[in-house]
Amino acid sequence: MADNDKNSCSCSFCGKVHSEVRKLIAGPSVFICNECIDLCSGILQEEGSSYKKGDTLDLKPKEIKKVLDEYVIGQEHSKKVLSVAVYNHYKRLSNSGIISDVEISKSNVLLIGPTGSGKTLLARTLARVLQVPFAMADATTLTEAGYVGEDVESILLKLLQAANFNVEAAQRGIIYIDEVDKISRKSENASITRDVSGEGVQQALLKVIEGTVSSVPPQGGRKHPHQEFIQINTDNILFIFGGAFDGLEKIIESRHQGSNMGFEANVQKASKDKDIFCYTEPEDLVKFGLIPEFVGRIPVITSLGELDEATLCRILVEPKNSLVKQYKKLFEMDNINLEFDDSALSEIARKAAVRKAGARGLRAILENLLLDLMFETPGTFNVDQIVISKQMVEESMVNSRLFLKH
């Protein structure tokens, strides 16, 4: 190429001519220089590595739990169990090329606890801490392949979407499946009839949990022969399951009937204190309706206790994204300072404890309590401070007592 021809060609991206760069590569009617190639390569590498921070093991179990403490109040044992399980999981991935003589199994986790005890929040916070893709699914929407409803590949698609279709990142992500107790089979004995939303789903999940290469349709929906698929290996995806398991406590109690008096007394005391789930054994889950193969793929089992009034009161104010902080921020956007008396917070926690809906009950109470205020005060120029009192919570008539500061 003559010098004049070289200088007439320029990079289609940065505009530099041939003499200003080391290399100019030609394509169909376009050119790109080595500098732009290096820049694009750096961007792609940065995006590809952004999800690999979970493998670096920068966070040790104590540090993981410390971050969980900032968002999740109470449930100390479960946070410790999760921190260790997750640390071991990503330690296993980081050393997969080093350890050859011993194969370390995945530390899939089962969280047992009542509604609103923090199961979903724990899983979601873990993914945020580790900076890995996170997907959540409801087991009650899943059906066996070939039947109406979502199949297990739809969960993997959600994980791929969370990873911006970065397959390598998705293969090291976390999947949380809630309401897993709802897919228990109808009886402990195998049934000759098809159970497409119970045992059938457990069988379908088995392959994904233990590790397989799944073909996922990128557009979702059911598979058909003429579509393209994304291949995703589930060997290194961490699965966390959650469920309330209503009725499991009776199975645990019956197992301990006739056992030595000391241990049985502990179980009876735990039953009264709502902590009986900490005595859960794999055989109890099988009797509940989970198939043995499914239970065998979940080596880590931990229970979350029912939240008491004192813990609910702490949940209102202590987490980084606590409900009180969220509502204060919403009112602050309208130039209104929202405050809560300590007695008001205690009353809100008491009402939530009575409802037995856990932390979810707190939001429902606050929404009802603040509804009229959130409707009336925007655009009201003579209101710049509102203080919520215990009486206002008791009566749920917040409009009747506004404390104004001019």
UniProtKB/Swiss-Prot annotation:
NCBIfam families: clpX, PRK05342.1
Residues in ClpX-type ZB domain copies: 1-52
Organism (species): Ehrlichia ruminantium (strain Gardel)
GO CC annotations on file: HslUV protease complex
Similarity field: Belongs to the ClpX chaperone family.
Keyword field contains Chaperone: yes
GO MF annotation, one: ATP binding
Positions annotated to bind ATP: P114, T115, G116, S117, G118, K119, T120, L121
Superkingdom per UniProt: Bacteria
SUPFAM superfamilies, sorted: Glucocorticoid receptor-like (DNA-binding domain), P-loop containing nucleoside triphosphate hydrolases
Keyword Metal-binding: yes
Xref: Pfam families: AAA_2 (PF07724), ClpB_D2-small (PF10431), zf-C4_ClpX (PF06689)
Keywords of the record: ATP-binding, Chaperone, Metal-binding, Nucleotide-binding, Zinc
Listed name of the protein: ATP-dependent Clp protease ATP-binding subunit ClpX
Classification via SMART domains: AAA, ClpB_D2-small, zf-C4_ClpX
Subunit-level organization: Component of the ClpX-ClpP complex. Forms a hexameric ring that, in the presence of ATP, binds to fourteen ClpP subunits assembled into a disk-like structure with a central cavity, resembling the structure of eukaryotic proteasomes.
Stated role: ATP-dependent specificity component of the Clp protease. It directs the protease to specific substrates. Can perform chaperone functions in the absence of ClpP.
InterPro entries on file: AAA+_ATPase, ATP-dep_Clp_protease_ClpX, ATPase_AAA_core, Clp_ATPase_C, Clp_protease_ATP-bd_su_ClpX, ClpX_bact, P-loop_NTPase, Znf_CppX_C4
BP term (GO), one: cell division
Positions annotated to bind Zn(2+): C11, C14, C33, C36
Organism taxonomic ancestry: Bacteria, Pseudomonadati, Pseudomonadota, Alphaproteobacteria, Rickettsiales
